[in-house]
Amino acid sequence: NKNVRLHLADRLHQTLPLYSNLGTVGVYVYAKDFDIPGRSATVTAEAQVRNEYAEPKTFSYEVTVAETDGKVLQRFKGGTATIAAGETRTVSASATLSNLNFWSWGYGYLYDVTTALKVDGRPVDAVVTRTGFRKLEFGHGIFKLNGRTLHLRGYAQRSTDEWPAVGQCVPPWLSDLSNALQIESGGNLVRWM
């Protein structure tokens, strides 16, 4: 069995992520300008917005970064835009966030980033992206995660046929078991094939 999700959206909406047959890229959240000791970074949220109305629409773009328990860390705005009928456009908002907990090996700290479109102050579309923020560096034969050198040891795992008779329908508990076996053996990296 596979999980199925039905997405219902206003005709002014943020597109679904990276579907080549739909020509969409969705929402992309990333961080840069890290200050690891100071626990801050600049967070950017970009969203591809599509207007399927027959007339232009003016909207504001707002971002909320929250803990997974709902506690809001920061809200910031990307301004107001007018999008023509049938147009698809990318909008963006950035802010420097402080008191961040960075995602790290053995400490998978996550945030819920909500990107919202508002027309006349009324929300018409919102997308929640669960993500973590971390600084990666590759150079001189060294890998660093949040400024700390990390020796990588891992596995090459195929996305299918790893468990006989299951195929692509891997339930979450079986994925958790695979991950636990890798960690118990000292692995900290999975290369998907």
Regions picked out by a protein language model, each given a short descriptive name:
Residues 1-193:
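Secreted/periplasmic carbohydrate-active enzymes, especially glycoside hydrolases
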